Amino acid sequence: MTFCYPCRAFALLTRGFTSFMSGWPRIYYKLLNLPLSILVKSKSIPADPAPELGLDTSRPIMYVLPYNSKADLLTLRAQCLAHDLPDPLEPLEIDGTLLPRYVFIHGGPRVFTYYTPKEESIKLFHDYLDLHRSNPNLDVQMVPVSVMFGRAPGREKGEVNPPLRMLNGVQKFFAVLWLGRDSFVRFSPSVSLRRMADEHGTDKTIAQKLARVARMHFARQRLAAVGPRLPARQDLFNKLLASRAIAKAVEDEARSKKISHEKAQQNAIALMEEIAANFSYEMIRLTDRILGFTWNRLYQGINVHNAERVRQLAHDGHELVYVPCHRSHMDYLLLSYVLYHQGLVPPHIAAGINLNFWPAGPIFRRLGAFFIRRTFKGNKLYSTVFREYLGELFSRGYSVEYFVEGGRSRTGRLLDPKTGTLSMTIQAMLRGGTRPITLIPIYIGYEHVMEVGTYAKELRGATKEKESLPQMLRGLSKLRNLGQGYVNFGEPMPLMTYLNQHVPDWRESIDPIEAVRPAWLTPTVNNIAADLMVRINNAGAANAMNLCCTALLASRQRSLTREQLTEQLNCYLDLMRNVPYSTDSTVPSASASELIDHALQMNKFEVEKDTIGDIIILPREQAVLMTYYRNNIAHMLVLPSLMAAIVTQHRHISRDVLMEHVNVLYPMLKAELFLRWDRDELPDVIDALANEMQRQGLITLQDDELHINPAHSRPLQLLAAGARETLQRYAITFWLLSANPSINRGTLEKESRTVAQRLSVLHGINAPEFFDKAVFSSLVLTLRDEGYISDSGDAEPAETMKVYQLLAELITSDVRLTIESATQGEG
């Protein structure tokens, strides 16, 4: 084989270098690696680069780093060896040519700043591309890697953010010394040099373009990891005060309250002090260490899924708005911790004003929290200041997080969304000048929620305890084994794309000065909010605790033998794996037996042993609390549960009749649990579930009819029980509506709750959400939307009775009698 003189010369030089590595260079790297191995404890992003980025270790891999740093190179080497990736210090031999496995894009700071030796990286890129020209089977994977020691964004001082953070030797020494344990090695998706060579050629101009694109990539990556510079707080306040919207609101405040302009302005500043975050990188670092120590002792693992899609959006310059579900006060800390360890900037977080107590308030402020009141009504100055502050965060490029539910879910299900902050987000777009805003729905799940006992008390009528230092200390003192945590990033929603599709002329409403409320805003915000809730549920996470709770609560006596529980978990797992709820949902890879062992370690269940085997029991006092975890995944199992309930009741039923029954009840289920399917998608989903239930032996399919299989009736009955309480609630409301067609919505909600409470006592229903006000309010609204009830309160008796008769077949006769007798004043 022949190749060019420079390649032969480089090959000879590299061979000499390799043999020389046994001498002084090897000693140099060993000496340098000794302090680095002590000072540097870096983390890899993603956690397991090869499978997460699709790297093929059987094909050649070369690494591209932003600038020349031996400390960075050795830090990269440590992570490569830890993850079974090729050693960057080992040269690549391709067709007899030895090439270094790493390329520095920039030579780093030098004494003579006009000398920037970029030619070396361009030459190496050209050599690699040239080898692809001569060898059509060659495909080198080029992996961009950036190593970061610390991620302080700095404060605004007028200078432009540098595209790369180049440190000289002394600066690098202190960075390693001080920030070695706050360092990250960020692997990016690989670039195929074969594709580059085939599509763009192999000449030197392509190599130059490759180097230029790599520099831009690293600059964007640093901005995504560090974020824009932070403003001085007083400068931010001065800018807000100077805005036309706040200036006008201050004038209105002075006029309406008959106070001086200076006093009104002081009121505005006081509101800014109340609202604004005071972000501190040092507090982030300190909290990261504390949380890292705490999580390792409290949690057995934090499971993160689909983070790469978020990193890519941040890299592409999107303004990220994180919209998680709200389970616990722990959500604030957990999500920021996860984002930080995924190489993303911790967001500014909209926190309830109830958390602004000492010392939590000042700490949360420094971690990025800005505080929001429960209501803006009657305070125009406050709403204007808050809206302008939120708009300023967007215009400066800071990521933001808020809980669209408005508060923590007390039932474990998603709450109906509160749209105020979401509306302000879209209004910020209507000011113009912001980067593309993308909403990121996030499902957060736990195997133990520390507030779950308090939630159950509140649902039964107890007054919510005000957040305070003593309450916080009591909560912390109870923290024990919390099991696993789950953070699943759902399908992002680019707002600009959404508006282009649904409100094509939205740009006509842009006003850079005044906050506008075009006619399309409210319905569009409501639709976006509902879509977000669906996407959050799409990213649901099944785990050992919620699966075991679902099975045990389905049993009449809240107990199953270990064999029965294993059988039931296998039923759930096979349904979720073979007919996935969505591509974003996650199901444990562990076996049913392993999940049961893990759940038993949480000390929520009791085990009775006899000569036959183990009986796993959910104690009565725990049953109410465990409904919370069951409800976390209710949406993932409700459709197969409904099908099982219908088949169990009828013993055998045709597909068409089954489809009719599901079609009648599905709108209520969809609205209550934010289910993902539209009605026209149901036939395919029901067919897939029926086929899976047949595969499991739960039913048989004969002549297009579904028949129960007596040999496997128990798992089918337990599966059906998952829909039992929901169907009972629907039966209550439809019976009341049938008995009194002229009943108004408020009375219907109230009487439905009263009957539900009665049913709960008489029939031992443990779920506190069974008579939750919000659940019945949502149901009645759905009945209005579906035409069962009008705004005037008139119902169509024939239609409501028809639905009630369908529901009456799916509930037990004693429950039906209790419901029907309640309206007649009987016991």
Curated annotation (Swiss-Prot):
InterPro entries, per database record: GPAT/DHAPAT, GPAT/DHAPAT_C, GPAT/DHAPAT_LPLAT, GPAT_PlsB, Plipid/glycerol_acylTrfase
**What biological process terms from GO does the record include?**
CDP-diacylglycerol biosynthetic process; fatty acid metabolic process
- Provide the protein name: Glycerol-3-phosphate acyltransferase
Membrane among the record's keywords?
A: yes
Enzyme Commission number(s) from the entry: 2.3.1.15
Q: CDD domains in the record, alphabetically?
A: LPLAT_DHAPAT-like
Q: Species name for this entry?
A: Shigella sonnei (strain Ss046)
Q: Report the principal subcellular site.
A: membrane
